Amino acid sequence: MKRTMLYLSLLAVSCSVSAAKYPVLTESSPEKAGFNVERLNQMDRWISQQVDAGYPGVNLLIIKDNQIVYRKAWGAAKKYDGSVLMEQPVKATTGTLYDLASNTKMYATNFALQKLMSEGKLHPDDRIAKYIPGFADSPNDTIKGKNTLRISDLLHHSGGFPADPQYPNKAVAGALYSQDKGQTLEMIKRTPLEYQPGSKHIYSDVDYMLLGFIVESVIGQPLDRYVEESIYRPLGLTHTVFNPLLKGFKPQQIAATELNGNTRDGVIHFPNIRTSTLWGQVHDEKAFYSMGGVSGHAGLFSNTGDIAVLMQTMLNGGGYGDVQLFSAETVKMFTTSSKEDATFGLGWRVNGNATMTPTFGTLASPQTYGHTGWTGTVTVIDPVNHMAIVMLSNKPHSPVADPQKNPNMFESGQLPIATYGWVVDQVYAALKQK
């Protein structure tokens, strides 16, 4: 009921308020923003050491009080060709595009949902079946609940779906196998629930794949076209896209990821699997093979400058410059902790307890929210300190440490920088040690 009343409030605001003038980002220096420069220099040297130790490439940007106060790139956008180190790596620059992985959930799908809910086109308590015909329990389902599943259940990752059905891998997915977007929706409808909806939180890509389909059902166009034309373009963003190679970008502008396609250095095989270095295509298997590169859970590419504008839009309460995407009430609704688990908002992860230290560190305010991405991306938005941090990297662009033991552990993932919270803590420590 509380969520519903808040929704009605935000809808009333969105209907009565015309486009407002919101703060826009300007450039400043760490000193003027109150940061201890030597502490930031120590962080800089440490990141350089991590790159020297094998971490591929990193971009870091810091916002404080509506100003970009720090922006830097380290390492390589591409340094491997297959498993062979390149003699002349492609350097990472502050403009390099990175595969955002699960940060797509926030900066594409959540932004779309926040906008549509502000416009009254969606409600968090709407049932999924309202937008996805045929989404229902079947007589043979052991666990039922699809008939009453709501949008908010998916946003809370409490919808009952498994974490990763691996639809494109026939040997794993079995009868749910799909490498076609239309067929994938049918497979999602058939995917058995693993627990009673609302009884727990299990982070699942399926939740956001389904939310992406819901957005497309409401707007009547592909998700990528909607967010690029209705969200990013009005904000002046030109480097935030799905399928960048199909939209005018060159590989040299983009950070590469896995060395040998999706094979984890040769131990994984399924129909049509990519085997050469991934450069400009989404790494995520479900997004690439099952969804054509455009999905609600993964597929978005961006750089730190564009992400900075999107984070500032959240700090501003839903707008940027003369553009209002959604209301402050919408932001509050989406970033308020769930009663069942303080670390989950509506999609956004919240700094609700110590389990979020690997993401938010130990110094961010409890109201801080953001998200991570499997490729090595993290965004941190702190409304109390009016600060935001984005770190983009291409963590999978390194050999797998032991493909037989753990095909998902890359050598770079064993380095301390792969725990984002350490970098986040250094930023906060620099602010507190003026």
Feature roles, as predicted:
Residues 123-141, 233-235:
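Short, glycine/proline-biased beta-turn/loop segments that scaffold the active-site neighborhood
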Residues 316, 329-330, 339-340, 353-357, ...:
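Short, gly/Ser/Thr-rich active-site loops of penicillin-recognizing serine hydrolases
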Residues 4-13:
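Sec-dependent N-terminal signal peptides
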Residues 368, 375-388:
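Short, surface-exposed beta-strand/loop micro-motifs that present aromatic residues
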Residues 28-98, 121, 400-409:
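Short, conserved catalytic-motif segment at the N-terminal edge
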Residues 23, 78, 139-366:
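Short, surface-exposed loop or secondary-structure junction motifs
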Residues 41, 47-48, 66, 98-128, ...:
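Active-site SXXK
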